[in-house]
C-alpha cells in the first residue's frame, strides 16, 4: 500500500555542496497540525548528530499556497492549517560537505546520501501506520551518473517498504561503472568513487573482487544462502579517511586509495577485513538484534549492554572468515592480530571499565573520546574481540575442536533473528546458547566474567592452549650520538 509520501533530492548543483530536498505528503491528515522531525542517530553509529544543523532555506506549501514552517525543539518543524489539505510540500537545502561514510557528501563528481540526515519524517498529523507503507524516493542527478541503491525501482525513482528500509537505503551516484557479479545465485554490486578523481587500479580492483567472492561464499557456508538476492557495496577511496557503516543489504566503506595500489599489504588486509565486517552485519545487527533495538527509537539515545557482541563478535568472526575463505593467508591473520595486540596492550582501561559498561556508555565514551580516555576506557570492538577469542579457544578445547563461537553466532541467528517466533537477544540468550552447545556447558561463568568484570582477558593463556605463544617484538636500539 502506498504511503502517500514522496522523498526527493536534487544533486544537480554539485558545486554548491548543498542538496535540494523536498518531502511531499498527501492527505488525509489527522488534525490541523503536521510535525516532521529528523532522526537524531542511526543504528551502527551511537552518536547524536543533529542533522538539522545542516538544513537551510526551509519553505512549506499547502495545496500550492506558501505557508509558514515553524522550527520546533532541536529536531523538528511544525506546519499548521493542514486539516482539510490534499497535499503538503516541504522544501529545504542540506549541506553535504562532510566526507565520511556516515554523512551526506555532494560535489561535481558524485553524491552520497544518508537518508536519515536528508529527509525528515512525519511524527504528528498523519496516521502512524502510513510510515510502514511503501514510500517513493526520487533522485535528480547528472545524466551520466548511475546509482547504487538497494531498493526496487528504476534509475532515479525507487520504492522503500516502510520507515526502516527507507532510512537504510543508502544512495551513491556517480559516473563510474556499476560492477556486478554473482555468488551462489546472489547478485553483488560494487560502486566505487575516488575523492581525488584518480584512476582506480585495475589489478587491485580485480584482486578485491576475487577476495569479495571468497568472503561472501564463506558467509553463506556459515549462515546459509540468504533470502535477499542482491547486495550493494559502496567503496569510497580517499587520501587517508577510513570507516564503514552497515545498511540493510548494503554497506558504505571508506579506505585510503593505496589499499588497491600494489605494495600496500597492510591496507589491503584492512580493506578485505572492513568489507567482511560490514557484510557480516547483515546477520549480526540487521537480522539479529538486541531486544530493545527491534523497533528503533531514533529521537533519543537507546542504550545496549551488548555492543561487545554486535561489534566485538563481528570483528573477530569477520576476520576469521577472511582467513577461512582464503582471502587472507595465515600470515595475514597473524600480522593483523599482532597489530590488534599492540593496541590491546597499549592501554589500561580494562581495570576501570567492563565490556558491558563500555557498550552501555558508547554514546559518551567511544564516540566522545578525549586525550585521557585510554587510561580508564576501552573499545568494545577491540576488547570484545579479545573476549570472544578467549571463549572460542576454550569452547574448541572442550569440544575437541568441533565447535566454536561461530557456531554460537549461527545458532543465535537462526533462533532469534527478525521474523522468528522469539526475535531479539539479551545476555541471557547468548549465555543459554553458549552453554547448550557441545563443550560449552561450563562456560557460562567465563562469559559472565569476561563481559561483566573489569579485568583483562587472558589472551596469552588462550594462545598457549592453541599450541602458540605471543612473543614481544625485539626492541630496536636507538642511535648512539657519542654521549654517555
Give, region by region, the residue ranges found by the protein language model.
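Zn2+-dependent metallopeptidase catalytic core
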Residues: 51-54, 132-149, 159-166, 197-231, ...
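Beta/coil-rich, acidic/histidine-enriched accessory regions frequently appended to metallopeptidases
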Residues: 1-4, 19, 418-484
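Extended, low-hydrophobicity, Ser/Thr/Pro/Gly-biased non-transmembrane segments
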Residues: 39, 61, 91-177
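Non-catalytic, glycine-rich low-complexity segments
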Residues: 1-15, 22-25
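Surface-exposed beta-strand/loop patches in extracellular or lumenal glycoproteins
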Residues: 19-52, 120-142
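Acidic/His/Gly-enriched intrinsically disordered linker/tail segments
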Residues: 288-296, 301-381, 416-419
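Juxtacatalytic substrate-recognition/specificity segment
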Residues: 180-307
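A surface-exposed beta-strand-loop module
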Residues: 11-12, 24, 45-108
